A protein has these predicted regions:
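Glycine-rich phosphate/diphosphate-binding loop of Rossmann-like nucleotide-binding domains
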Residues: 12-57
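Short glycine/serine/threonine-rich phosphate/pyrophosphate-binding segments
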Residues: 26-31, 55-56, 75-85, 105, ...
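Glycine-rich phosphate-binding loop
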Residues: 60-98
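Short glycine-rich or small-residue beta-strand-to-loop segments that form or flank ligand, phosphate
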Residues: 16-23, 71-73, 124-126
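Anion-binding alpha/beta catalytic cores of soluble intermediary-metabolism enzymes, centered on
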Residues: 1-12
Length: 152
C-alpha cells in the first residue's frame, strides 16, 4: 500500500530495476525493494525463485537479467545468489540478505557475511532492508535516466 497526495506526479524514468529472489521466502523484502524503486520512477520487473540450488532456473533468465540497468538480488541461507548474479551481468547488483535459513543462517548473518565477502563487484544492504535496497536502486536508476536524457 502506497499513499500519495492527489497532486503527486510520479516520475517515469528511462531505467529499469530487476528485483530477483532466490526463493519464495525472500518475497517480502524483495517486494519492498520493488515498490520503492517503482515509486521512485523506475520500471520494475520481479524475477522470482531462481536460487542457486538449481542453476538452470537462473541461467534460463540471463537475458532478462541482463536487460535491466540495476538489479536487487535477495537471498537468505548462505546468500550465494547475489554473488553469482554479479559475476554473470554487467550492471550494478545490490545484494539484499534475508533472515531465512537454519542455525547460524537463520538471522541472515550467513547471507550478510557471504555477500560482504563476495569477490564479485557487489553492493550490500543490511538484513531484510528491502526499503534501503529499493531506494539505492532507484537512485541509480535516476542517474541512468539523467544520463540518457542528457544524451538525447
Amino acid at each position: 500500500l502506497v499513499a500519495t497526495r492527489p497532486s503527486f506526479d510520479r516520475a517515469e524514468l528511462d531505467a529499469s530495476v530487476g528485483v530477483v529472489t532466490a526463493g519464495t521466502s525472500d518475497a517480502v523484502p524483495a517486494g519492498e525493494a520493488a515498490v520503492i524503486a517503482g515509486e521512485m520512477g523506475a520500471r520494475t520487473d520481479r524475477i522470482d525463485d531462481v536460487g542457486v540450488a538449481a542453476l538452470t532456473r537462473l541461467t534460463d533468465q540471463l537475458d532478462r537479467l541482463r536487460s535491466h540497468d540495476v538489479l536487487v538480488v535477495a537471498a537468505g541461507r548462505e546468500g550465494a545468489l547475489p554473488t553469482v548474479v554479479a559475476g554473470l551481468v554487467d550492471v550494478p547488483v545490490i545484494g539484499l540478505p534475508v533472515s531465512t535459513g537454519y542455525g547460524h543462517g537463520g538471522n541472515g548473518e550467513a547471507a550478510l557475511s557471504g555477500m560482504l565477502q563476495s569477490c564479485t563487484a557487489l553492493s550490500v544492504v543490511n538484513v531484510d532492508a528491502g526499503f534501503t535496497a529499493g531506494a539505492q536502486a532507484g537512485l541509480i536508476a535516476r542517474q541512468i535516466d539523467a544520463t540518457r536524457t542528457a544524451e538525447e
